[in-house]
Amino acid sequence: MISAQNLVYSLQGRRLTDNVSLTFPGGEIVAILGPNGAGKSTLLRQLTGYLQPDSGECRLFNKPLNEWSITELAKHRAVMRQNSHMAFPFSVQEVIQMGRHPHRTGNQDNETAQIMALCDCQALANRDYRQLSGGEQQRVQLARLLVQLWEPTPSPKWLFLDEPTSALDIHHQQHLFRLLRQLVHERQFNVCCILHDLNLAAHYADRVVLMQKGKVIANGKPQDVLTQQALTMLYGADITVLKDPANHSPLIVLDH
């Protein structure tokens, strides 16, 4: 379980997270939604130990994040940031194998090959990472995270993904979320992701968190949270929320 209690973080006099408390019990895909500047990425950085809050506390398995060593924390959670540029000419396979750094054993070629296949990266293996498209880089970064967390442990693993679909085509968006569901159900993975695509969140997330001006304003199942009234107030956009006939999840449509 990961928990956040009364997180406050300010920068240049502006509250980026304002008394945020959340619990992530595990076994689910959680989507964090909100307009630009709502505090989503700041919250994610605090939940993963990359940013210390001004006040409040984050815990992993009831142990404060600041009491975990970097190496041990990296065995339990992995993070995909919005930007993953590299200055040096690493091959795709080398980038993916960087996920082994927290572990004492060296590269596991069979494991790496399996994960590259899961993430549709086999054909990219020998290419210069810097020459890939944005979507290809996102697939490679996901593979690196899975290599980092693939080694079996008694406790669950956590994937934190900041806008993981921002550069993916529709096929790879679907592939990503089907894979995430498989990891949740079969390998004790838990997923927390920031999204801007409301319909992806409605279709695939087990739980949705809405943020506005550093505060959590809603937290629950997609059908309870993604209402027309809530989304219109949150985004200031003219939208209609319908019901998807295939699975009865919310279907968000922009009005003309």
UniProtKB/Swiss-Prot annotation:
Listed GO MF terms: ATP binding; ATP hydrolysis activity
E.C. designation(s): 7.6.2.-
Mode of membrane association: Peripheral membrane protein
Enzyme class: translocase
Ranges for domain ABC transporter: 2-238
Compartment annotation: Cell inner membrane
Entry GO CC: plasma membrane
Residues bound to ATP: 34-41
Cited InterPro entries: AAA+_ATPase, ABC_transporter-like_ATP-bd, ABC_transporter-like_CS, P-loop_NTPase
Similarity section: Belongs to the ABC transporter superfamily. Heme (hemin) importer (TC 3.A.1.14.5) family.
Biological function: Part of the ABC transporter complex HmuTUV involved in hemin import. Responsible for energy coupling to the transport system.
Quaternary structure and partners: The complex is composed of two ATP-binding proteins (HmuV), two transmembrane proteins (HmuU) and a solute-binding protein (HmuT).
Protein name: Hemin import ATP-binding protein HmuV
Organism: Escherichia coli O157:H7
